Amino acid sequence: MNLGTLVSETRNPQTMDLDALPTPELVKRFNEQDTRVAEAVKATLPDVARAVDAAAAALKSGGRIIYMGAGTSGRLGVLDASECPPTFGVPHGLVVGLIAGGPGALLKAVEGAEDSQQAGEDDLVALNLQEQDLVVGLAASGRTPYVIGGLRYARQSGCTTVAVSCNPDSPIAREANIAISPVVGPEALTGSTRLKSGTAQKMVLNMISTGAMVKFGKVYQNLMVDMKATNVKLVDRACRMVVEATGIGREEAEALLKQTDFEVKPAILMALTGLDAAAAREKLAAHQGFLRAALEH
């Protein structure tokens, strides 16, 4: 493949003079380019919705969401995966981020790590990949061998696969059941796909993980009711969520949370139904953790 023909590698005619610009104009040019990212992502929303449903289906069937990528793309996957346990109360390992070259590549580039299809397969083998898992391959260029190898192995293993790329009709898209391709155009700094391409990928990942967790019962209204209250800020947030969801006073909310070890969902259910903590947990379990269903039935 001639990489120079990729949209993400071509020069942007609107930023040819970056090195001659005064600082206010320099940052204005970057900002002007960034405004195009949301529109590019908007054009992919039908495919993002399919990915959300596939991710939720994977979780409900006992599978995992596995992101894999190299460089910036890999780091974004690891970032999104690492935020899921504290935000949604899920166990570590339910959402996984793989980066070419291993964890050390998060801080320092591992030269050549992305160029091996076998490495992508090997990393999934090491995770004991199961057909219930969803594998999401991330590559701004759409042609990273590490990601191609991983997606190909995942597909052969019976997994649903998703490709996220910022070039149209990319090689990784052809390896996936669902292709998401926000074409953001040439970068302000030629080929620096940590810019618009990285922003677009982050926006897509935000929707995939958050949307899947909504459909997995981890959200009530727009509240992260399975959040782990692990510090003073989050204990305060837990209290505010109970107050906002129920209309009770703060002192009563704090008292309920102490009975639930600061778990928000049973505290809300207790406030709205009069159940005790054990009965609230039992009712939530009977409705697979969906608070709305527990309240309505």
From Swiss-Prot:
Q: Which GO terms describe its biological process?
A: 1,6-anhydro-N-acetyl-beta-muramic acid catabolic process; amino sugar catabolic process; N-acetylmuramic acid catabolic process; peptidoglycan turnover
List, alphabetically, the HAMAP family matched.
MurQ
Q: What is the protein's known function? A: Specifically catalyzes the cleavage of the D-lactyl ether substituent of MurNAc 6-phosphate, producing GlcNAc 6-phosphate and D-lactate. Together with AnmK, is also required for the utilization of anhydro-N-acetylmuramic acid (anhMurNAc) either imported from the medium or derived from its own cell wall murein, and thus plays a role in cell wall recycling.
Question: Pathway involvement?
Answer: Amino-sugar metabolism; 1,6-anhydro-N-acetylmuramate degradation; Amino-sugar metabolism; N-acetylmuramate degradation; Cell wall biogenesis; peptidoglycan recycling
Protein name (record): N-acetylmuramic acid 6-phosphate etherase
User: Under which EC number(s) is this enzyme classified?
Assistant: 4.2.1.126
Q: Which organism is it from?
A: Salmonella choleraesuis (strain SC-B67)
What does the record give under GO molecular function?
carbohydrate derivative binding; carbon-oxygen lyase activity; ether hydrolase activity
Q: What induces or represses this gene?
A: Induced by MurNAc 6-phosphate that releases the repressor MurR from the DNA. Repressed by MurR in the absence of MurNAc 6-phosphate.
Top-level lineage group: Bacteria
SUPFAM superfamilies noted in UniProt: SIS domain
- Catalytic reaction list: N-acetyl-D-muramate 6-phosphate + H2O = N-acetyl-D-glucosamine 6-phosphate + (R)-lactate
Q: Which CDD domains match?
A: SIS_Etherase
Q: Record's family? A: Belongs to the GCKR-like family. MurNAc-6-P etherase subfamily.
Q: Where is the SIS domain?
A: 55-218
On subunit structure and binding partners, the annotation says: Homodimer.
Q: What else is known?
A: A lyase-type mechanism (elimination/hydration) is suggested for the cleavage of the lactyl ether bond of MurNAc 6-phosphate, with the formation of an alpha,beta-unsaturated aldehyde intermediate with (E)-stereochemistry, followed by the syn addition of water to give product.
Q: Which InterPro entries match?
A: Etherase_MurQ, Glucokinase_regulatory_CS, MURQ/GCKR, SIS_dom, SIS_dom_sf
Q: Which Pfam family, giving just one, matches this sequence?
A: GKRP_SIS_N
- Cross-referenced PANTHER family: GLUCOKINASE REGULATORY PROTEIN (PTHR10088), N-ACETYLMURAMIC ACID 6-PHOSPHATE ETHERASE (PTHR10088:SF5)
Active site annotated at which positions? E83, E114
Keywords (alphabetical) are: Carbohydrate metabolism, Lyase
